[in-house]
Amino acid sequence: MNVTLLIPARYGSSRFPGKPLAHINGKPMIQHVYERASLAKGLKDIYVATDDVRIKNAVESFGGKVVMTGENAASGTDRIDEAISILGLADDDLVINLQGDQPLIDPIVIEQLVSVCERHAGEFDMATLGVEIKDEAQLNDPNHVKVVFDNNHNALYFSRARIPFGRDTSDYPVYKHIGIYAYTRKFIQTFAKLPLGRLEELEKLEQLRALEYGYKIKVAISAFDFPEVDTPEDIRICEARLTVD
C-alpha cells in the first residue's frame, strides 16, 4: 500500500491570516508540521497542497514538496481532492490528510493511523484519531472538537459541544478529535462530490458529511495530545512546548 501524506494550507484565515507562515521558534509553522510528518515511517511522499505562492516559496526554501491547487477550493478536502488528481495517485493508494495547524504532531500517531488502515482495510471508509481530554478548559471550548464512537470505535458524532452529556455525573471520559484523516483516493473523490450536509453546515465540521451520507469513520485512540494553532495566542503555547521537548 502506497501512502502519501498531504498537508492542505491556505494563507487566508478570518481568525489568523497567514497562519501557515507564522513563526514558531524561528521557523514557519508549516515547516514544523512538514518536518515532524517526515519522521513518520512508511510514507512514500509528503506534499503541501496550497494555492498561495508565499506558502509555496516557504516550503520549497526548506526542501519540501508542493502541489499547487486552484484558488476556488471550498475546503481542505476539496484541496486534497484536487492535489491527488494532479499527483495521479492510484484508486487504492492511502492518503493521509494532516492539517497544517499542528506543529507539534507526533509522528507516532501518523504511523498509528496508517497501521489501523492496513490491519482493517475494507472495514471502514475513512479513519481518524481521538484522545481523551485531560484539560478541563477544553471540555466546553468549541475550538476543541469532541467525538463519540460505538463499541467498535466507529464514529457516531462529532461536535463542538461537550458530548456525551452526563445527566447524573460528570465523571466520565470525553474524547477530543485530532484533525488527521486517512482514506483512499477512490473514497476522497466520492466524498468531495457529495453535497454539503445539514449537520456539517451547522457545526462547520467536514467529517460530519461522511456520517450524514452513511459512511463509516474509524476512530483510533491516541495516547498523545498536542496543541493545534487556531489563534495567534496559541503560538506561545507551542513555543513553550517546543522548548520543553
UniProtKB/Swiss-Prot annotation:
The keyword Isomerase appears for this protein: no
EC main group: transferase
Keyword flag Lyase: no
GO terms for cellular component: cytosol
GO molecular function, one term: 3-deoxy-manno-octulosonate cytidylyltransferase activity
Pfam families, per the entry: CTP_transf_3
This protein's UniProt keywords: Cytoplasm, Lipopolysaccharide biosynthesis, Nucleotidyltransferase, Transferase
GO process annotations (BP): lipopolysaccharide biosynthetic process
Location(s) in or outside the cell: Cytoplasm
Domain of life: Bacteria
EC number per UniProt: 2.7.7.90
Pathway participation: Bacterial outer membrane biogenesis; lipopolysaccharide biosynthesis
Catalytic activity: 8-amino-3,8-dideoxy-alpha-D-manno-octulosonate + CTP = CMP-8-amino-3,8-dideoxy-alpha-D-manno-oct-2-ulosonate + diphosphate
PANTHER family: 3-DEOXY-MANNO-OCTULOSONATE CYTIDYLYLTRANSFERASE, 3-DEOXY-MANNO-OCTULOSONATE CYTIDYLYLTRANSFERASE, MITOCHONDRIAL
Summary of the function given for this chain in its UniProt record: Activates KDO8N (a required 8-carbon sugar) for incorporation into bacterial lipopolysaccharide in the Shewanella genus.
Family the entry assigns: Belongs to the KdsB family.
Listed HAMAP family: KdsB
Protein name, per record: 8-amino-3,8-dideoxy-manno-octulosonate cytidylyltransferase
This protein's encoding gene: kdsB
